[in-house]
């Protein structure tokens, strides 16, 4: 009965979420044609908040004292599911866009919309020319006052734990001297897991950790920077997973108490 209820609830949540998305997106497309997307950022945030609500997610944001909301930066975030960008847009208190695979920009309508809104295409970085282009476009976004979201794992988690980080984003931040804000998405793995379309109502907590300077770092410091930021991001995620496993291992009578 529990599984049947989860199935029916998921169908309803997906239906309402997609219906709202399909109604709202044409409005954003029309506005993007005639207006700079910066002019209606509030509307985009409203869309993201409604997507979170209709999918069964309650967003809670926790800011560390050392997080500087006034500085343009790069947000390094763990990657859990397809809802991550929407949840982050609800919680990050500044204009923000993201790195996105260049192949996505070739998708009809969607690709144009992502380009128009200012996302940065990530090409095949084995090609030095493409790498320079990525560096240049990232620098232009930062100089224009747009913070960027990077998922350094390069893929979504399959088990809830934070995967190993790729080094590219950290090398870029070090070379450009852009500050990094580690951010943790906690609870998203319960909301929706990769490979399982079941949506579960839950609270998703976005931790915005202390802003970390990179301008005085050298190339040799990048591996240590990467390890440090992974540890910061993973800490609340691991604590949440540990609490969940402890609750599941408790006897039913104790859980109900």
Tell me what each language-model feature is.
Residues 4, 132-257:
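Non-catalytic C-terminal accessory region of glycerolipid acyltransferases
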Residues 4, 8-11, 15, 43-51, ...:
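Hydrophobic alpha-helical segments of integral membrane proteins
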Residues 4, 8-33:
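A hydrophobic membrane-anchoring feature enriched in long, contiguous, low-charge segments
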Residues 24-45, 52-56, 63, 67-127:
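Catalytic core of membrane glycerolipid acyltransferases/transacylases, capturing the structured
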Residues 51-52, 114, 141, 173:
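A generic structural signal for well-ordered alpha-helical segments
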Residues 55-62, 131-132, 188-190:
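Short gly/ser/thr-rich secondary-structure transition/capping motifs
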